[in-house]
């Protein structure tokens, strides 16, 4: 019986709980399993008073911002680096990304000043397509994002402007991560190398 082997089931929730906690005065929000973009969407909805269901362009930009931030140093060159082909300066002191966003949803990707790494159109493009399956329908609990018309523009050193993400309502179902007992053990490793 399958029910006898289930160990866990975690539904990926959206930003509403985060926004509510902030509205109630929380300085720190601890959540259960939420989607990665929800960690950005929640504070933006709170700060700018957005309605998740009525602002498709703002929400598209919020989902994109959260998606670019979700893996931290990936968008600042950590995953992009391929020594000798795609060089990233001072990779050993990789800086984490920052998003500077306004109430319209327009934003710039940058990084901590003085840190290593690289924020470029290419690092942003590479992170945008990471784990999304379909650029026209990236499913999150808060919205189905459409990244098919997104543009990235280098506006300064380690500064990239991101525009034109939108959404098409919420998905009908939510993602669930299920763990079950089945006598399988896996091990993985990622190695990086390059010509240098």
Where are these regions (language model features)?
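Alpha/propeptide regions of enzymes that mature by internal proteolysis
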Residues: 1-42, 48, 68, 121-141
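Catalytic cores of large soluble enzymes that bind and process phosphate-bearing ligands
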Residues: 6-13, 56-60, 113-120, 168, ...
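Short acidic, glycine/proline-enriched helix-loop-strand junctions
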Residues: 45-52, 59
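A conserved active-site cap/scaffold subdomain adjacent to cofactor or substrate pockets
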Residues: 57-161
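C-terminal non-catalytic interaction/assembly regions of soluble proteins
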Residues: 141, 146-196
């Amino acid at each position: 019986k399958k029910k006898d082997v289930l160990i866990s089931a975690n539904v990926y929730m959206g930003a509403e709980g985060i926004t509510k906690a902030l509205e109630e005065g929380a300085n720190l929000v601890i959540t259960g399993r939420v989607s990665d973009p929800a960690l950005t969407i929640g504070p933006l909805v709170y700060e700018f008073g957005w309605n998740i269901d009525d602002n498709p362009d703002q929400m598209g930009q919020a989902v994109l911002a959260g998606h670019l931030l979700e893996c931290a140093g990936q968008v600042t060159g950590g995953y992009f680096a391929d020594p000798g082909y795609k060089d990233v300066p001072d990779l050993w002191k990789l800086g984490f990304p920052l998003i500077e966003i306004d109430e319209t949803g327009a934003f710039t990707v940058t990084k901590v000043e003085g840190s290593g790494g690289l924020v470029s159109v290419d690092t942003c493009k590479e992170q945008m397509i990471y784990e999304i399956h379909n650029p026209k329908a990236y499913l999150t609990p808060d919205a189905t994002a459409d990244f098919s018309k997104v543009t990235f523009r280098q506006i300064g050193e380690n500064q990239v402007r991101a525009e034109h993400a939108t959404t098409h309502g919420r998905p009908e179902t939510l993602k669930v991560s299920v763990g079950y007992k089945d006598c399988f053990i896996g091990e993985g490793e990622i190695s990086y190398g390059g010509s240098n």
